[in-house]
Amino acid sequence: MGILKAASSKKNLRPCVIGIDPGLANTGYGIISFSNNRFECIEYGSISTEPHLLQGERLLKIFDKVSELIEKYRPKEAGIETLYFAKNATSAMSVSEARGVVLLALAQGGVRVGEYAPNSIKKAVTGIAQAEKRQVQEAVKLILGLKEIPRPDHAADALAAAITKINLGDVGEVRAYV
């Protein structure tokens, strides 16, 4: 469990963006950089929490792991999907709580957050606001020059949020170094 590393964990020496796809069971994350008109994937994965833990313990684990990523990579910018209300109110509440602790960790780390609607992320990554999940995953793979689609799905979604932060020009320091 914990952080699943699916890409390089080398120390980042240039400005980067963290993308987060919050969820109580699995919170996806992705760290990318952008320079010389080229994206680079630094690390991605998922923070998993066990269902037998108390709600507060699960939220603390998410907070601690996101804080560790911020400490390790020192991102100045973050992209996160806005919460959309699903039919399942319990699920929406859990995602909202996870999102809250992620936003707290980002605020404590001095990370500037851009929040994007799902269709905005799809459009920024694929050019199509109504793109299917698989199209977004393929676009993330292509944009970041990865050999395969990032797994788990939450990590791919987080990388898409980070790409959106850059593609929409909603970054300060990252673009300043381009």
From Swiss-Prot:
Cofactor (UniProt): Mg(2+)
GO BP term, pick one: DNA recombination
Residues engaged in binding Mg(2+) 2: 81
One Gene Ontology term, aspect cellular component: Holliday junction resolvase complex
Residues binding Mg(2+) 1, per UniProt: 21, 154
Chemical reaction(s) catalysed: Endonucleolytic cleavage at a junction such as a reciprocal single-stranded crossover between two homologous DNA duplexes (Holliday junction)
Keywords: Cytoplasm, DNA damage, DNA recombination, DNA repair, DNA-binding, Endonuclease, Hydrolase, Magnesium, Metal-binding, Nuclease
Protein family per UniProt: Belongs to the RuvC family.
HAMAP family the record matches: RuvC
Function: The RuvA-RuvB-RuvC complex processes Holliday junction (HJ) DNA during genetic recombination and DNA repair. Endonuclease that resolves HJ intermediates. Cleaves cruciform DNA by making single-stranded nicks across the HJ at symmetrical positions within the homologous arms, yielding a 5'-phosphate and a 3'-hydroxyl group; requires a central core of homology in the junction. The consensus cleavage sequence is 5'-(A/T)TT(C/G)-3'. Cleavage occurs on the 3'-side of the TT dinucleotide at the point of strand exchange.
Name of this protein: Crossover junction endodeoxyribonuclease RuvC
The species this protein was found in: Treponema denticola (strain ATCC 35405 / DSM 14222 / CIP 103919 / JCM 8153 / KCTC 15104)
Source taxonomy: Bacteria, Pseudomonadati, Spirochaetota, Spirochaetia, Spirochaetales
